[in-house]
């Protein structure tokens, strides 16, 4: 009895210590994320103010990105794939140089007009920093636990959604499985990172929806149908990204030639298509949806295509923010077709296409709750569940373990 009590006390003591350790780790990650976010906001402002000076140099920026990563990246060129390999213990090292290289590459992509996000880099920053710290700490399985902890902190520091960040980090590595051993430090690190980033002026998107819509059987059918469409869209994005990268890699084997040639094409397209409307994160399109500004029926499709081309060419950045944009703009179009308030359908698309693209369920539901308000959690649950079932196990993270069933 005494031995069992001692064992329990040691277990709970270690668990508590893990949770406490997550606080300073999260704070450090939150500081880095805040600086990174400010950098991205600054280069975005420069691009918007001087679009016709920046876009012509997109191809040249691509050359710099690829050349620098080829020379200095080493194994770190694997990006999120390397993060997943380390989580599965197929690799054992995450070089610290991944952090500055990823930040520089993403900043150049956005300065010169590429269509990309920031989440992938934010998660990499958190994962690399926390994994490195975890190797110095005297905990069992510390590097793996703190890898997940850092992913949560990175997501929360960038997006200001700590609950969704925790769930995303423990859910995303293997579809259908949760890394519960990292739950407590991920929780404390996530809230710590979010708080520090907020203190430094980084605010989450607040896109509250103010619509009263009773959940009738007819609405339920329409919500499920929306979820199916959103899930297919997110899954299709992941599938197209994977196969476009493969196709371009086979057709244009030299990465410098590939990024330059496609960069030239992209710079022309971005200029012709509403003068940079589809450059960058796409938050301008999300704001247009929720502020009642002009939204074209094909906005989502053009953002879809241009983001895939940008990332497949060799430019750097995440996929999640474009997924939010694709979902919101597609949702705005479908809301009119399905007789659902545009704000509500756009909010549902924002979360569900993210879930369909990342092959996550709970993270998508809570992203919806944290961004748009928890009053609509039942709607997010219905739509995101349908999206998760119908995304066909596709994921933007090609190294994600697919343990959930296939439809």
Please describe what each predicted stretch is.
Residues 1-407:
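Alpha-helical transmembrane segments and immediately membrane-proximal extracytoplasmic
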């Amino acid at each position: 009895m005494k031995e069992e009590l001692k064992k329990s006390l040691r277990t709970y003591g270690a668990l508590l210590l893990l949770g406490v350790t997550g606080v300073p780790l999260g704070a450090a990650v939150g500081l880095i994320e805040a600086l990174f976010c400010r950098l991205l906001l600054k280069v975005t402002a420069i691009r918007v103010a001087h679009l016709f000076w920046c876009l012509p140099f997109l191809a040249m920026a691509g050359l710099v990105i690829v050349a620098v990563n080829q020379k200095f990246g080493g194994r770190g060129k694997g990006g999120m794939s390397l993060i997943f390999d380390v989580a599965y213990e197929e690799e054992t090292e995450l070089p610290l140089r991944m952090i500055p290289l990823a930040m520089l590459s993403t900043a150049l992509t956005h300065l010169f007009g590429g269509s990309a996000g920031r989440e992938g880099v934010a998660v990499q920053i958190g994962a690399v920093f926390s994994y490195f710290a975890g190797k110095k700490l005297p905990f069992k399985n510390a590097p793996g636990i703190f890898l997940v902890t850092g992913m949560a902190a990175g997501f929360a520091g960038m997006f200001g959604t700590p609950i969704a960040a925790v769930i995303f980090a423990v859910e995303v590595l293997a579809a259908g499985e949760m890394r519960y051993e990292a739950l407590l430090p991920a929780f404390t690190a996530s809230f710590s990172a979010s708080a520090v980033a907020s203190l430094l002026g980084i605010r989450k998107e607040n896109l509250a929806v103010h619509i009263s819509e009773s959940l009738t059987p007819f609405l339920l059918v329409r919500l499920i149908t929306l979820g199916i469409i959103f899930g297919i869209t997110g899954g299709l994005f992941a599938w197209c990204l994977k196969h476009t990268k493969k196709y371009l890699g086979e057709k244009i084997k030299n990465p410098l030639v590939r990024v330059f040639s496609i960069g030239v094409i992209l710079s022309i397209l971005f200029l012709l298509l509403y003068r940079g409307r589809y450059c960058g994160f796409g938050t301008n399109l999300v704001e247009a949806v929720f502020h009642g500004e002009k939204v074209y029926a094909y906005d989502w499709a053009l953002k879809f295509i241009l983001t895939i081309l940008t990332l497949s060419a060799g430019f750097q950045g995440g996929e999640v923010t474009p997924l939010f944009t694709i979902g919101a703009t597609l949702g705005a179009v479908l809301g009119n077709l399905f007789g659902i308030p545009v704000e509500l359908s756009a909010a549902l698309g924002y979360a569900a296409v993210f879930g369909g693209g990342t092959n996550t369920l709970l993270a998508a539901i809570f992203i919806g709750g944290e961004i748009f308000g928890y009053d609509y959690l039942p709607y997010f649950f219905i739509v995101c569940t349908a999206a998760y079932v119908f995304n066909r196990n596709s994921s933007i993270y090609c190294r994600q373990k697919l343990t959930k069933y296939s439809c």
